């Protein structure tokens, strides 16, 4: 027996021939996305993050009625924003006139309450301790803006109690020389009227 070697030539189709014969070639899962696809994804993610931050800021500063956030540009630090006004609740105590001077020095005024809704809101933030507000008895109880007290009553037990104060339970008359906390009120922007 002789050893004989048989050679055979195999002709395998090329990739383009196989694609033509069997339809479109499917990309394998290991193929890389193109550079432009990566850039588009990165820009989309960046846009989503920026929109989320903007939405968060809007909700924090505008969406709620009151806020103590430092990022709200319309009120100074340590002032609380509610509606269209900023409120400052003091931590120290002064007499009524010194409290008024403190507020005026900050382009604000002692609190003038415009309605029961505002009064109810502010009482949530107050304790048993009384705070000076912009209310005085000069031939009748009047706010610092000149308007009369007409939506609430004020408790008084002496004719020397001519300045108004507020705590979580309501309005109270007090002697103007008593040192109390105070509440200032101002518009968020300096170019608006104080009252």
Swiss-Prot record:
TM stretches of this protein: 39-59
Residue positions of motif ITIM motif: 5-10
Main subcellular location: membrane
Domain C-type lectin: 82-185
Gene3D superfamilies, alphabetized: Mannose-Binding Protein A, subunit A
Pfam families with a match to the protein in the record: Lectin_C (PF00059)
Keyword Coiled coil: no
Domain notes for this protein: Contains 1 copy of a cytoplasmic motif that is referred to as the immunoreceptor tyrosine-based inhibitor motif (ITIM). This motif is involved in modulation of cellular responses. Upon phosphorylation of ITIM motif KLRG1 associates with the two phosphatases PTPN11 and INPP5D.
Stated name of the protein: Killer cell lectin-like receptor subfamily G member 1
Source organism (scientific name): Homo sapiens (Human)
